[in-house]
A protein has these predicted regions:
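N-terminal secretory signal peptides that target proteins for export/translocation
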Residues: 1-14
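Conserved alpha/beta-hydrolase "acid-adjacent" motif
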Residues: 425-429
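A catalytic-pocket lid/entrance helix-loop region that shapes and gates access to the active site
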Residues: 217-219, 224-327, 454, 468-472
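Alpha/beta-hydrolase fold nucleophile elbow
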Residues: 197-208
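Glycine-rich nucleophile elbow surrounding the catalytic serine of serine-hydrolase chemistry
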Residues: 207-217
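Cap/lid segment of the alpha/beta-hydrolase catalytic domain
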Residues: 119, 128-196, 243-244, 251-254, ...
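Catalytic-loop region of hydrolases
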Residues: 36-120, 134-137, 269, 282-287, ...
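Short beta-strand/loop motif that positions the catalytic acidic residue
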Residues: 417-419
């Protein structure tokens, strides 16, 4: 039987210090709402955009500073922009392009400043995991929201994924995120010159991939850069992230008999729900707390002919391994998080391929074996020597796992962490990091500075893939702004389902390690009928 237990002892200390539930307001700040304490007055430019071309920035050359008319911006092609059509909804803004010399690289970055209606924020745009392009698409969203923004290519351009490592291994140092740190400082300087006053709030709000990695790097290494930050489904353990993806692939590809076709995943999911859905008092197709779910896929062992409602013995073995914590074959050290009961409908992207997930392939090809011709079929990865190669000193710069957030906390910084139990990047990594922060910084200090919400049924970055998928229905930046300006932390959040033809549901989610519990009466789709309790 497999019972997944995250470490919760330190987090329980936080729960005991939480204010009484009756005194806590439920946070339900809808996307697009702009009503919160400390909301910023809108500001217009005080000088011309072109004037900024003459601003002196350390080790930096400003190559252009031009006003872009409303609706006229056409993004460059490629990953950062992805389209050649104009973004007609963009407001008028000042576009500054510049290059900074650092780390033996020409780091390109852009700063976008709304010409009117600036909300007082500087909100950096997160990078792709390997850099390579300025994140225009993310900057588009942020400027549309009224923020000044900055994005950088991290000094890595012209390469696919991490292939740059073969020719320029020194550029791995760029993934320590010094380029973003420098760009944020320059953005604040330019915003101050343009508007005649400095930014009132600096915040990042990113999900998955490189963006959430950037958030974690910022709060760990440069605590003065941001007043607040939001990291959703963050991937701060780059060296082990790829290893975990190979673990899932290998579990179901050790032989043709171990492969689990996607047609069988609904049966595994249904069996997991039968085992654990009712633990919170509500049968709603979602497991509230998978960490306390006793589920063995062996209950699905075929008793007769193989079919999509049962598993063969090798498939049972494969499913059990997917739920297991990946471990070093020799030292038995845990490597990464594991998949949770209830997540089965989201396995296909990891196990339904002939080769491992693309991130894992590129990671092993360029950072583990340094062989551009490597394929998994020709040389399957192992969990002994290959783990040691993955964690070679030169690769560790991409990890941002330091739990010592005392610098950020002591400045009054606020960090909101969100994970999804159904994420195919196992949420246990998020939980483990949070627990380490609590242990390092102290439960009392963390209570006032860091919150973790783990959302039942939530896929990666709020993705909704089936009727049991929940999304977070609130403005995270507004939440951390309110927290920063009033001291009121988000003690509860509300999630919902919204897929066409799906049952409309809204549920209460509590700060980890608390869980939502049905009070016993009233609609189970009304969050008012749930309360937060410690398991």
């Amino acid at each position: 039987m497999y019972k997944i237990r995250p470490h919760i002892s330190s987090a329980l200390k936080i729960h005991r210090m939480l204010v009484p539930l009756a005194a806590v307001a439920v946070l339900i700040i809808l996307i697009g709402a702009r009503v919160w304490p400390g909301a910023q007055a809108q500001t217009a430019a005080s000088i011309s955009c072109e004037t900024l071309a003459s601003v002196s920035l350390p080790n930096t050359a400003i190559t252009s500073a031009q006003k872009v008319a409303a609706g006229a911006f056409v993004p460059p092609g490629g990953r950062g922009g992805a389209t050649a059509a104009p973004w007609t909804e963009l407001p008028e803004f000042c576009r500054i392009a510049a290059t900074t010399k650092m780390l033996n690289s020409d780091v390109k970055f852009e700063v976008w400043l709304p010409a009117r209606g600036w909300n007082g924020d500087v909100q950096p745009a997160g990078s792709s995991f390997w850099g390579g392009a300025i994140p225009f698409a993310r900057m588009r969203t942020l400027v549309n929201g009224g923020a000044a923004t900055v994005g950088t290519n991290l000094g890595i351009e012209g390469f696919a994924g991490p292939s740059f490592v073969l020719e320029h291994p020194e550029k791995l140092e760029n993934l320590k995120m010094d380029p973003l740190h420098a760009a944020i400082g320059h953005a604040k300087t330019l915003a101050t010159r343009f508007y005649g006053s400095g930014p009132r709030f600096s915040v990042m709000d990113e999900c998955g991939g490189g963006g959430s990695r950037d958030v974690m790097a910022e709060v760990q290494r440069w605590p003065a850069d941001l007043d607040a930050a939001v990291a959703v489904n963050f991937t701060n353990y780059g060296t082990r992230h790829g290893i975990s993806q190979v673990w899932m692939h290998q579990a179901t590809h050790r032989s043709p008999a171990h492969f689990i076709p996607s047609e069988k995943l609904p049966a595994i999911h249904a069996a997991a729900l039968d085992a654990c859905d009712l633990r919170d008092g509500v049968k709603d197709g979602v497991i509230e707390d998978p960490s306390r779910c006793n589920f063995d896929p062996g209950v699905l062992l075929c008793k007769g002919a193989d079919n999509n409602k049962c598993l063969t013995a090798p498939q049972v073995d494969a499913a059990r391994r997917v739920y297991e914590t990946p471990r070093h074959a020799r030292t038995k050290e845990p490597i990464y998080g594991h998949m949770s009961p209830g997540s089965e409908l989201d396995w296909a992207s990891m196990i339904g391929r002939d080769e491992p997930y693309p991130y894992a392939q590129s990671f092993y090809r360029y950072l583990v074996y340094r062989d551009p011709n490597w394929t998994y079929a020709a040389r399957p990865a192992n969990f002994d020597g290959d783990v040691d190669l993955a964690e070679a000193p030169q690769n560790l710069v991409m990890n941002h796992t330091n739990p010592d957030l005392s610098g950020f906390v002591s400045r009054g910084g606020k960090l909101l962490l969100v994970g999804g139990w159904n994420d195919n990047l196992p949420v246990q990594n998020v939980i483990t990091y949070y627990e380490r922060v609590v242990a390092k910084v102290s439960a009392d200090k963390v209570r006032n500075a860091v919150r973790l919400f783990v959302v039942p049924g939530m896929h990666h970055c709020f993705g909704e893939t089936h009727p049991g998928s929940y999304k977070v229905d609130f403005d995270a930046v507004a939440a951390v702004r309110q927290w920063k300006t009033t001291g009121r932390a988000p003690e509860q959040i509300v999630v919902s389902t919204s897929g066409e033809g799906w049952p409309a549901r809204r549920r209460l989610v509590c700060p980890y390690p608390q869980v939502s519990k049905y009070k016993g009466s009233g609609s189970t789709d009304d969050p008012a009928n749930f309360t937060c309790r410690t398991p």
